[in-house]
Amino acid sequence: MWCKNQVGSGNMDLRRDALQILKETSRTFYIPISILPPGLQEAVASAYLCMRAIDEIEDHPELDNATKAKLLRAISLTLQAGVDGFALDAFSAGFSGYENTLAEVTVGIREWSLLAPETIAPRIWDATAAMADRMAYWAETNWKIYTESDLDRYTFGVAGAVGLLLSDLWTWYDGTQTNRTQAIGFGRGLQAVNILRNHTEDLRRGVDFFPEGWSAADMQEYARRNLALAEAYTNSLPTGPALDFCQIPFTLAYGTLDALANGKEKLSRSDVFALIKQLIDVNVKAS
């Protein structure tokens, strides 16, 4: 039984489920995705959830690295075989024996892959498959980052490439043109902030994304350098859904950097909502 990407009541249910899972997994991205127009919303939600599905494998506390690599490569190969959808059991063989261990968002990857409109869905499958392969490589090396080039390689693989995908989604939706080098910086900058925020927790599980000899100040500098590209990327966007989307994670990333520099562990929920309200107020005045 094959399921194409169709618009209908089933797709409405899938969209509702996707937004609910999104809300449970990431408030940071739930808000900007929830304000996107129909069509683009499904595409960006599909991309986010497919990538979150593989990210949950990469970060899974109960799986060893060899198992992570095996699961990630199985997902990649399944996505590469997509034609006009995926059989109901397409991903099951790859998950066999791990169904009760994996996160709900991971087990639901088939549904997320079918959420985007069919004219763009294969681009999301492509990006997710490539990212899963890269994650498998990093799992096998236990995420050993020795140099800044290693860090650039990692942040491109799991985030800079997301910036490239978003650029393709904006162009697909309404023809918006963007600078792809800045798009990579957008992804890398957000990822560098995550690395800073999660550094202590990562060390506890035996993973260190800091290049050898780097301090938090060095990673701050790396994050700010990439966020300068992210700022150029965001500022170049015309008024519209792409700008509305990008402003929110960009603003929260800068807010998180400032909070970390001032000794806080992260932004509080009230900080997040205050920053977003400020952004909305500015946009309302500008419109």
Name every feature range the model reports, one short phrase each.
Residues W2-L190, L196-S287:
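Catalytic cores of Mg2+-dependent Asp-rich isoprenoid enzymes
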